[in-house]
Amino acid sequence: MSVETKEISQTAMALVLGIQHQVKYYLSKVHVSDNDFEKYKGKTLPELKNEKYIFKTYPFTKFTKKGGKDICGQKDNEMTTPKEVGEYVAKEYSPMAFAIVRRFFGLTPESMIESICGEGNLTPPNLGSGKSGSLFMFTKDHKFVIKVIPKREEKILCKIFPLYFSYIQENPQTLIPRFYGMFRIKPQKDEEYRYVVMNNLFPNDNFPLQYKFDLKGSMYGRKANEKERNKKSPCFKDLDFVEQKAEIHIGPKLLQPFKEQVEKDSGLMAKMHLIDYSMLVGVHNLTEEELEVACKRLGIEVNKTKKEKVIENDKERKRDEKEEAKDQIINTNDNIIGEPAQKHDESGSNETEEKESKQEESK
């Protein structure tokens, strides 16, 4: 390992530990009462503009090896940092609003802390490898994604968050990412990271994905490169989707709600003046048993009929082959038995003709 790689690994590990420490601290401190949850749940955007309290972001908090003082000036030993991290400063954006979002989606602080903050629960990022300044870390249980974002994306999220907050409560089945928290951390003097905690779109490890499609509805430059294709679970793009003649089958029960939700989500993106977004589609090749269960669950009768037809045709083919084999045996037996009989008849008639001719000659 080179010195540079070693330094990057140490920095990445320090970042992971800092994030875990920060998330645990903030999530355990922010509590949403039943009254607050009912008060702000379902608020429209105009109503939320008068409730700036829930979108308030507090100043940076300093975490040291000896602990520190919280935002109320009280001594807090939980602010003592891990020895691998050292001193750092951090902040959480709109803690009350994000706490309401988490509760709205059925998350508790304890469940998130358990997934994110345990030892070895977060994969260290490959610093410097992210496109457009973005990096991803996944929790070991596949429930959450931590995305390190550039400053410009942080500004956009801060700007659109009130609209997002209102929209997800009106559309709980939305397909857009679920943002559970946004933070900033500065573990060293010359480094600063902004990150969001999101839901993992493909959390179930029982259904491993053979490949994924990142679809934008555009064809220009939308083809996976060789490096991406060689990955264990490659992510293909629009041109690959067309070239592979891929299809997405949605059952009749889900098709109309799905289309309506996509239209609503696209309308939200337009309202937010966002154009760089895509639909991520995961593909898992079903086994025969999984296919039967999926067809029943989604109400897809077409695939089931096709499957039955295949089985029926296979049975008919085997039955026809069996009948054909029987016919061949019968024909063969006819040939073996019938031909000598024919010869016998012919020889018998010849003998009769010879006797009759001899009798005529004697006369």
Give the ranges of each region predicted by the language model.
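Polybasic, positively charged surfaces/segments
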Residues: M1-K363
